[in-house]
Amino acid sequence: PTALEADEGGLRVGLLPRQFGDLHELQGGEHCTRTVWFGFDRDAAALRQRLTGYHDPLSATCEPSVYSHSQAIPYLPAGDGGYRDELRVILQEALEGDRSFFSKREAIDEYGWRNYGDMWADHEEAYCPDERRPVISHYNNQYDLLYGMLIQFLLTGDRRWWQLADPLARHVIDIDLYHTERDKAAYNGGLFWHTAHYHD
């Protein structure tokens, strides 16, 4: 929740609260999914442990080679994909260092209800004067980064790929999918391409 209020009369949880200084805009076809957990346990240590399980749940995975040998995902290579060294460097930079996806999320403080999980399209600053940076724009999964992250997770077993893919998937499901049957058939249920490029 983004707001909590408590008094003698009860507890109020704000998911899109009025205390926010602006509007919460949901465009046609968008969803906003929230989960709220209540724990009324007087044992603070037990409650903390239970919440840890919610925030970082156990997940069962296989050795990366099992996925490729199963052929459940067509053309999934075995091992590390046989990548050239140049590609390995790019993939490593996606996870570590100042230009990693994690660092970019921190740089623009991308933790809001609408865009958390989406990736900053920082390449759109290319023609922008320094005084107008950062230009906040998003990929909206237009190049299927989600698929790439999930494939890297399966190939490497590196949980950081999952830590990026999971919130991106949740963002795509709520914001980037056009949840309607009232538009043209070609658009209904498809991806909502709503990025304006190269301007702030």
List PLM regions with ranges.
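Catalytic cores of extracellular degradative/oxidative enzymes
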Residues: 1-200
